[in-house]
Amino acid sequence: MDKLLIRGRKPLDGEIRISGAKNAALPILAATLLADEPVTVGNLPHLNDITTMIELLGRMGVELLIDEKMSVEVHANTIKHFHAPYELVKTMRASILVLGPLVAHFGEAEVSLPGGCAIGTRPVNLHIHGLEMMGADIKVENGYIKAKTNGRLKGAHIFLDTVTVTGTENLMMAAALAEGKTILENAAREPEVVDLAECLIAMGADIKGHGTATIEINGVERLHGCHYNVLPDRIETGTYLVAAAATGGRVKVKDTREDILEAVLLKLEEAGAHITTGPDWIELDMKGKRPKAVSLRTAPYPAFPTDMQAQFAAMNAVAEGSGTIVETVFENRFMHLQELIRMGADITLEGNAAIIKGVEHLTGAPVMATDLRASASLVIAGLMADGDTIVDRIYHIDRGYECIEEKLQLLGASIRRLPA
């Protein structure tokens, strides 16, 4: 397994380009299954999960044309079968997103129960229940979700018991081709959900209310082709901004948007960062100062994102004062804290809250990534620490960050990949 070797205590300084959002690209790639004509998806990040989703479509017989800029043209009508096998689904939870489009467009689907990051129980029962309300006949057997429908799905009024991003996306895609009106209540409001809705609208779907807790979808008979560019990755944007703040540096991130990152930018300003923004860029400057500790509570969008708490935990570890981080979205999301403690962080865990007292500096150590965002926090810790840090199991990082060591090198970091 590859590792990252980081030599710390250098403030980051420079400019980088932000990649397309993986969490928007995956549902949009799944949505191409709904169209009768080719759909081209642009601004895709070069990531393992994207490759897996493209491979999954290819395994089903879907014809794909990929250019050198990672734009993909998808011809869903060439599909041969409707089976998403365990060996692909186990590596990526988002494979469940093909369930709704397959049932809605082709009347059947067989999708393995998902795998992915080891952060708590993320149930798929809301997807299944919603599709059943729309008339799908679903059995779960031998580790597979097997769904069928006679004719078109029917619009339904669906209340989601908990806010679920992939559940909202799956049901919104299915409803786009259903007969009649579907209302999704307690829907996820994340920018990636909005981006999927905008792509579906570009394909001819009739959707209103995306970005609010109530989405209304009037089903249409068919969806046509379109060309759609995926929105920028707000978590990648936030990660590089926090890395610069934690090291007392300056960074300008380009090809991104501030409007999808407001909760994070407010916390960075609270930590003492000077932030300026333009139409497609954000600049952060710590002016050489040590960050101030911040307290935060994660919750679904537009509140503070769970995918950014690990990075702030790393920053708090060397900040002035102490801060409390409360995780309300997922259990098991503090696995990185033990590794930070091994590097000298002063952290007390109380249930779903972590109290972090800033220390003058961390010390480099061998550490191990446990999930995608935890691994980003360990990289940030390594950038701040005295001496060398080796981050193991970085396949987690490669699932969510495109060329992380190359982008950090552009910002002046001493970081390199050690091949297995």
Swiss-Prot record:
It catalyses: phosphoenolpyruvate + UDP-N-acetyl-alpha-D-glucosamine = UDP-N-acetyl-3-O-(1-carboxyvinyl)-alpha-D-glucosamine + phosphate. Its EC number is 2.5.1.7. UDP-N-acetyl-alpha-D-glucosamine binds at R93, D307, V329. One of its GO terms (cellular component) is cytoplasm. It is found in: Cytoplasm. It is an enzyme of class 2 (transferase). One of its GO terms (molecular function) is UDP-N-acetylglucosamine 1-carboxyvinyltransferase activity. InterPro entries: Enolpyruvate_Tfrase_dom, Enolpyruvate_Tfrase_sf, MurA_subfamily, RNA3'P_cycl/enolpyr_Trfase_a/b, UDP_GlcNAc_COvinyl_MurA. Phosphoenolpyruvate binds at K22, N23. SUPFAM superfamilies: EPT/RTPC-like. Signal peptide: none annotated. Its main location: cytoplasm. Keywords: Cell cycle, Cell division, Cell shape, Cell wall biogenesis/degradation, Cytoplasm, Peptidoglycan synthesis, Pyruvate, Transferase. GO terms for biological process: cell division; cell wall organization; peptidoglycan biosynthetic process; regulation of cell shape; UDP-N-acetylgalactosamine biosynthetic process. Gene3D superfamilies: Enolpyruvate transferase domain. It holds the Pfam family EPSP_synthase. The modification 2-(S-cysteinyl)pyruvic acid O-phosphothioketal is found at C117. Pathway: Cell wall biogenesis; peptidoglycan biosynthesis. The keyword GTP-binding does not apply. The active site is at C117. Disulfide bonds: none annotated. Cell wall formation. Adds enolpyruvyl to UDP-N-acetylglucosamine. Belongs to the EPSP synthase family. MurA subfamily. This is UDP-N-acetylglucosamine 1-carboxyvinyltransferase. The lineage of its organism: Bacteria, Pseudomonadati, Pseudomonadota, Gammaproteobacteria, Pseudomonadales.
